[in-house]
Amino acid sequence: MSPLNVGIVGTGIFARDRHLPSYQEFPDKFKVIAAFNRHKAKALDFAKVADIPENKVYDNLDEILNDPHVDYIDALLPAQFNADIVEKAVKAGKPVILEKPIAANLDQAKEIVKIAESTPLPVGVAENWLYLPCIKIAKEQIEKIGPVVAFTHNSTGPFVTQNKYLTTTWRQKPEHIGGFLSDGGVHQLALVISLLGEFGSVSALTRQVRERSGADDIVFATVQLKNKEVIGSFTYGSAFGATEKSVFLKVYGKNGTVTVDLSDKKDPVVKVKLGGSAEDNGDEQIFKVDNDESFGVNAEFLNFHEAVSKKDKSLYLGTPRTAFHHLACVDAFLKSSAKNGDYVKIEQP
């Protein structure tokens, strides 16, 4: 089978530094053949790196969408433009994969879910954390400690003043709800929800620590899952002063605990302690997780390739409905904080 021809819409930092290398790693499956940026000079710069001929560089969105040689669209746009690109891509008969967050707000996200579920074309959200190898290992171990009772999630770290993504205007003045809370927080939510299930309601307090974040950049929340049998805490923010980077999810069951530790991206581990009491307390088991340098990006593209090539959208894991729930959790955090921590139910698409 010939590789799928990819049209890149939005040729910024992540397109160049992460999407393109992933595509180039699998030349038998993908070929980036076209690029769009409303500033054509930026598209031309990307084209040089991607080896795209100049006649396939566009500053008119309709032209790349209607290019008969493009098999699908990879859209890396500010979130407020995602609903528009989905509508236009589907109308042009093109599958489309979007960068997260799914949209700038829940109304736009609902529209994307509606369009995606009314077409046979694959429409996906590129949530790479859904594909982390640690998830499979952790799921197997969580089955051993059940029933699950509670969890603690923590993703905290120091503010990185040289963060290259802070230079982008759409992040400095975000139109998407929560700014960095939705831009980065949806990753953490993808991990927790993949392992434990959807959130039902939250009580949260959010704050803006750094002016450069453009919006609230930390959240401390308590959570009740949709099944109401599991409660937990969710903490996220990398806007603090000097501190260690700490990313972990600890799951408490009646018969033990499972901890997913991603603090060191290059050396993730899953830790397990089995036993039903202090007296019945087994030795800790540590499961090393294979290092994935792409941190799930390669796997998400291979999954989307499968869905497009087989013309079966059900094969793709990162559905708009799934991504909607992640954004809806951020929306609930913000609404709860505005009500001084009152419990808020997670909105449905």
Curated annotation (Swiss-Prot):
Superkingdom = Eukaryota
Q: Which InterPro entries match?
A: Gfo/Idh/MocA-like_OxRdtase_C, Gfo/Idh/MocA-like_OxRdtase_N, NAD(P)-bd_dom_sf
The cellular component terms of Gene Ontology attached to this UniProt record, alphabetical and capped at eight, are: cytoplasm; nucleus
Give the modified residues of type Phosphoserine. S2
Molecular function (GO) terms listed? nucleotide binding; oxidoreductase activity; oxidoreductase activity, acting on NAD(P)H
Recite the other comments.
Answer: Present with 9600 molecules/cell in log phase SD medium.
Q: What is this protein called?
A: Uncharacterized protein YMR315W
Tell me the organism. Answer: Saccharomyces cerevisiae (strain ATCC 204508 / S288c)
**Organism lineage string:** Eukaryota, Fungi, Dikarya, Ascomycota, Saccharomycotina
